[in-house]
Amino acid sequence: CTGEPGRDRDRPAAGAQMPEKAAAGLFGETERIGGGREDMLDKNKISLGIAPIGWTNDDMPDLGKENSFEQTVSEMALAGFQGTEVGSHYPSDPIVLKKALDLRGLRICNRWFSSFLISRPYEETEAAFLRELSFLKAVGAERIGVSEQSYSTQGILDQPILEGKHVMSEEEWERLVTGLNRLGKLAEERGMKLCYHHHMGTVVQTEEEIDRFMDSVDPELVFLLFDSGHCSFAGIDPEKVLKKYIRRTRHIHLKDLRKKVAERAARERWSFLKGVREGCFTVPGDGDVDFAPLFQIIEESGYEGWVLVEAEQDPARANPLEYAIKARKYIAEHTGL
């Protein structure tokens, strides 16, 4: 207590709603309206979040180990974001997690879930999936991002990311599709949507695999988690994929790619994790992905839901708060969000 006269009179009453400007972090309404950008995306339909992987990396815990959960979510709010996905260093108690986020005006929008449908008994994945659904429901999320991790090379340090990827057999395709449809039904029954994350080093990486996947799964139960960075790294035109599947997309990752670093990764046969360390990925506006047509597709489709900045890189090289602010400014200037 400071004991300064009049200090308490300036504070909002307990439970009072913060003024809109105060909740906007670094981006007051006047600043966001400036810059000559168009109000392309509707704030009433689209929420803007950022992933914690820019602060601490779940696959390489030494990257950002100095960044606490409290620092991470405080900086997200300060940079002007509305929500976050769940990171490995977040509290496992949904009550504790939700309270910490409520204090900062943040919400949980999604969490990564690793399925092993083609290499392990279905029941094993289902049990883990149900536990995850229960947790996400408790913290108010409506999406669960699933990636099939059977035979994934993304975490193998000596495996070149553009080589040796597992290609599914017909039987494996059937197991994957059948299993995901079952999981999608479980999610639907709980008021949630299963969004599948195509990803480097996994069984759904290439354009052909994405197309076959989308042609095979039940469109009422399994949706797409679109990731601009993973499309670009895989040599796919992200505009083409998003335009084709925007009506079936229920979660979006905005990830940029540094083309020269990605080309070096291919030339020198880097693993996925080395590529992350060396800076293949970055925030929107800092790399070579053209986001203008992606924003236009999102706007024209009437998409409703979350778009999330996700850019895993070494926080010692790319200060997380600095890059969060950079991404937030870029998106504000180009979309009006």
Question: Where are the model-predicted features located?
Answer:
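Active-site beta-loop-alpha junctions enriched in small/polar residues
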Residues: 53-55, 87-89, 113-117, 149-151, ...
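Active-site mouth loops of central-metabolism enzymes
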Residues: 54-67, 116-125, 166-172, 283
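Short, Lys/Arg-enriched N-terminal segments with co-localized hydrophobic residues
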Residues: 26-39
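Conserved, mostly hydrophobic/aromatic
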Residues: 50, 76, 84, 101, ...
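Acidic (Asp/Glu)-rich catalytic clusters
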Residues: 41-45, 74-78, 91-110, 128-141, ...
